[in-house]
Amino acid sequence: MIETILLDAQERMGKCVDATKNQMAKVRTGRAHPSLLDSIQVSYYGAMSPLKQVANVGIEDSRTLSVTVFDRSMVQAVEKAIMTSDLGLNPMTAGATLRIPLPALTEERRKDFIKVVRNEAENGRIAIRNVRRDAISEVKKLEKAKECTEDDVRRSEDEVQKYTDAHIKNVDEVLTAKEKELMEV
C-alpha cells in the first residue's frame, strides 16, 4: 500500500516538473522556436483551432519563424491571430507563407521574462511540495488505520522527501538553463 502511494507521488512530481518545463518553453527567448506559437488559436470556419492544426510552423533562421498555411484562404485569419496574440509579433505575408521576424529582446524585457520564469519555477516547486504533503498525509492515514507501523511512516516520509528534493533540483536546473538562454544576446 505504501509503495503505491510512493509511486503515485513520484509520478505526480514528475508531471509537475513536465508542466513547469512546458510553461517555461512558452516564454520567448531571443531565438526562434516553433513552440512559441503553440498557444495561438485561429478562427477556422467559425471554430477556434490551434495554429498547428491549420498551418505548419518551422524555423527559417535563428530569428525568423515561417508559418505555411495549409488552406490559402486562411492566411488572413492566421496573420490576424498572430498579430493579436500577446507575443508582440508582426508577420509578413508572402503567398501561403508567413514570415515572422523575432525582434531582439531589450535588457528590460529580458529581466521581465526572467521574473516570469522564476515565478513559473516557484509554482512548480509549490506543486511538488503539495504532492509531498498529500503523500505524507496518505501514509499517516494508513498509520491511523493500523495498516502500517510508525517505522514504515518514517521510512516513507524520508523516501517522499528524497523524491521531493530530486524533483525540485530538476526544476531548479530547468530554471537555470532558461535564465541562461534568456540572457544570451
Curated annotation (Swiss-Prot):
Disulfide bonds: none annotated. Its main location: cytoplasm. One of its GO terms (biological process) is cytoplasmic translational termination. Keywords: Cytoplasm, Protein biosynthesis. It is found in: Cytoplasm. SUPFAM superfamilies: Ribosome recycling factor, RRF. InterPro entries: Ribosome_recyc_fac, Ribosome_recyc_fac_dom, RRF_sf. GO terms for cellular component: cytosol. It comes from the Bacteria. One of its GO terms (molecular function) is ribosomal large subunit binding. HAMAP family: RRF. Belongs to the RRF family. This is Ribosome-recycling factor. The lineage of its organism: Bacteria, Pseudomonadati, Pseudomonadota, Gammaproteobacteria, Alteromonadales.
